[in-house]
Amino acid sequence: MSQQPSGQGISEKIQNLASKYGQMLNELDKAVVGRYDSKTAVLLGLMTGFPTLLVGDRGVAKTMLIELLPKVIEGLNDKDVFVVQVSEYTDPSEIFGVPDIQKLVNGEGFDLKTDGFLPSAKVAFIDEIFYTSEKVRSTLLRAINEKKINVFGKEIKLPWIAFYAAANKVDLENPSDLALLDRFNIRGFILDIPFIMDNVDKLADETMQVMSASENPELKKVITLNDVEETRKVLDQMVRDFFNSKEALDLLKKVYYVIGDILASLKDTDAYESFYRSADEDYTHISTRARKRLNYVAASIALVRGATKPTYLDYLLALLFTLPVDVQSFKIVRDKIRDEWNKAVSGQEDTDATKVILDYLNDRLLTEAFIKASKMFDTSRNAIENLGKKIPLAQPFENREPTLVSSLPKIVEFLTRPEPISYSIWLMTKDKNGKINVGREKTGELSGNPLQKLEELLKLLESYRKVLDEADSPEERKTLILGLSKLVVNFGSTSSYQNGYKVPFLTLLDAISLFINNLKSTDVQKVIEQVVNDAKNNALKSISNGAPEVSGWEVFAPLLEQYGMKVPGILEAKRQIEDRAKGLSKNLDNTVTEIMNAGEKIMEMDDEMTKTFISLAS
């Protein structure tokens, strides 16, 4: 096709072009609702420069899409686009230009006026191309093949960068139609929705979109003619690099096996008899030109999604735009490709991509939120030291300050462990006579994400505050506080306290009080938003880097859904990440609010215990 691109690295060029082509499709969506098959065929024709045939009923936006190209491509004007609807009565002059009478009168010889006709067009569109007369058709064949025409002995080079044609149907029994059909390297079949009763929802949805859309939307020019030229150089390099790689041979064998299976399904069709059966009737024929166009179309699909080389899925989608030759063969190819595609994608869904990401959001995300908040403890050492100075150096509190400083990391470590943690503590209860007793040992488990564990811990501590509230007198309350001061909370792995940690009850209250105080002095919503966004972006990055062969399919998702083909699992994971992140922001905010409310009560208990010991020591 073209020379090797220079300047930026190939990967950077691909990312830049992929972004622009994605924007181009978005712009076209503003003016044409649905019709993703048409848009994709037009896009592939523009990228590759391959002549492209659009086959479909009237009113499926074939002409409209071509006429929209100047609105989205910088450097392409309306006058650069030649659109004509032909019939068997169309005169060659309506396509190739009219004689310049003035030059003949002036004795300057014969010439054509080509402004506004095919010879001056950068983009050409011939509607109902199979209705052309033989006289017009022979000239068109050369215009498509060689980008040249000869009119009255004058050789004219054609400047078109994209050549499109449209038809309602293809007559495979007409040799002349077959010759013309073979020149179109890309063929898009645009089928309207069959069986209205079976597609009520889709029809209603599309109608709503059409009726609510702006009649003349303002489109942006998001790509340039230079970008189109650069694309073809990049495609050359992508194809060249791919065929120099080790995986190319195995991948092509896999693709050709699918092609063989499809052609076997076509054996009783007109398409096979007219187009794919070789001169030796025992063999199926696929031309070198057809194999070449398949590689470039697959590379184009890969480029649009930002990949540096085509994959099996790119080739499968490319077959839909290169293999069928009429509506009947398209339906067979589409169904076979859909089955093979969904089988391949289902295999990818079994990978751990989605699970890993959702686990990340469910667990690691909240762990990071807690760790970020817990790091604020470091700024509270002065508060801890000041607290320690206020408390008399009497048993059991002589080590309160250093115990708290050393306990904080351990408390955070246990709360942020991914697995559940067990605990044991002695219960304080009030008997029927009103006497407060330290009763049996209570054991339990804190599970869930770190904030859920903290929430459960606060509920546990809340039960002791309720016991305090049931005290009948200040003296009884002091007695209870002294009893609480002797309690120790044991943390450990589930069902075992091996490698566990003992935390004095009061130290635990101090730690929670500091945590709640820090939350109160922090813009919690901002912290949550930052943590969620960081985690989401890291997840999106890791999932894309981990599976490049199934990344970037967002741009083709509507087309895949139109054909009944599953969107690769990586895209579904990304969607779930976005949805999960939104939900997590809200859930985190609610959880922190609940923790703050519960924490306030724990702080009151901690404050009362501190004041009690200060008063006892004075």
From Swiss-Prot:
UniProt feature coiled coil, ranges: 570-598
Tagged with keyword Hydrolase: no
Cell compartments where the protein resides: Virion
Sorted UniProt keywords: Coiled coil, Virion
Any one Gene Ontology cellular component term annotated for this protein: virion component
Main location class: virion
Pfam families attached to this UniProt entry: bpMoxR
Superkingdom assignment: Viruses
Name of this protein: Structural protein ORF618
Source lineage: Viruses, Viruses incertae sedis, Bicaudaviridae, Bicaudavirus
